Amino acid sequence: DCNGNAILDICDIAAGTSLDDNGNGTPDECECFATEYCTASANSSGLPAQIHATGSLDIGTGTFGLLADDCPPGAMGLFYYGTSSVYMPFYNGFRCVGGNIFRLFPASPIGGNGVATHQADFNTTPMGSGAGAVYPGSTWYFQFWFRDHPAGGWEVNLSNGLEVTFCP
């Protein structure tokens, strides 16, 4: 009974009260996934920055993290997340995260290899409590914002987006 409704999952699926679109026997609302979405613009590295999930999507393991690659080496950036997805021009790129926005401090330095990382902490604000609390079964949208002085223009760009549904 992954969704805690006191009905066996197989019975939920058979009764049609839970969907199982992929036919794996687990109700869709109980599955976790990370899907990249939204288009990023090329930055001064010549490539668009890409965001990825690292570790496990199971909150209980405490290993979930974020990684952005193809970023301008030596710059600084900030991972952030929100309650919905959008697609709108923003600085030198596109904003992919909307709704209520939560920043993940501290800022992340981009290494010489063009990679920035952030290890999630589900025990502190904003991920651990309040409006930005991440809990099993919740879906959030992540993106990486970074300085890009050599690119000119607004001197700021963003990665693509990452939609994550965390495991119960």
Stretches found by the model and what they are:
Residues 1-33:
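Extracellular calcium-associated, cysteine-rich motifs in secreted modular proteins
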Residues 32-168:
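Residue-level hotspots within well-ordered secondary structure
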